[in-house]
């Protein structure tokens, strides 16, 4: 048994290569091999968002606070609120973040395949974000 104590891991700033705007990442769990699943609480300030990306085994988001937006490639921008759960299928190109005026926090859960949980791509343009 391993108990991950709240606040035991340091918060981190979302790197500019992967995010637009101010993003804080609070790791929640990342068990050792052979386990593959990891989770983090991710907080986006208004206007902040991920770059386009995919996950080899998919991703689940559980919205905790605020108002956010998500989009899969070729689809409309969708609004997400506390209590909403979003599933992105393996390989589905997408982004997620806060709305333009309201911060948003979600728990992100994904699995690693070959030691990798995400493939980062280009940034979401302001035009794409505001659609």
Label every PLM stretch briefly.
Residues 1-37, 117-131:
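A short, N-terminal "cap"/entry segment at the start of jelly-roll beta-barrel domains
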Residues 24-27, 38-55, 90:
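Conserved short histidine dyad/triad with adjacent acidic residue
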Residues 30, 54, 62, 80-82, ...:
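Conserved strand-loop elements at the edges of beta-sheets that form or border functional pockets
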Residues 41-45, 54-70, 109-111:
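Short, conserved beta-strand element in jelly-roll/cupin
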Residues 50-52, 70-71, 88, 93-100:
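Short beta-strand His + acidic residue motifs that chelate non-heme Fe in jelly-roll/DSBH
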Residues 60, 87, 101-121:
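A short hydrophobic beta-strand segment most commonly corresponding to one strand
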Residues 74-91:
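Short acidic-glycine-tyrosine-enriched beta hairpin
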């Amino acid at each position: 048994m391993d108990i991950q104590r709240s606040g035991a891991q340091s918060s981190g700033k979302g790197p500019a290569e992967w995010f637009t705007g101010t993003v804080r990442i609070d790791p929640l769990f990342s068990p050792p091999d052979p386990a593959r699943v990891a989770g983090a609480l991710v907080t986006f300030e208004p206007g902040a968002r991920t770059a386009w990306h995919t996950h080899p085994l998919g991703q689940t988001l559980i919205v905790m606070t605020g108002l956010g937006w998500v989009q899969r490639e070729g689809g409309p921008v969708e609004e997400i609120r506390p209590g909403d759960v979003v599933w992105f299928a393996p390989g589905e190109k997408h982004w997620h973040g806060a709305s333009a005026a309201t911060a948003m926090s979600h728990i992100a859960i994904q699995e690693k395949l070959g030691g990798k949980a995400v493939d980062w791509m280009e940034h979401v343009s302001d035009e794409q974000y505001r659609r």
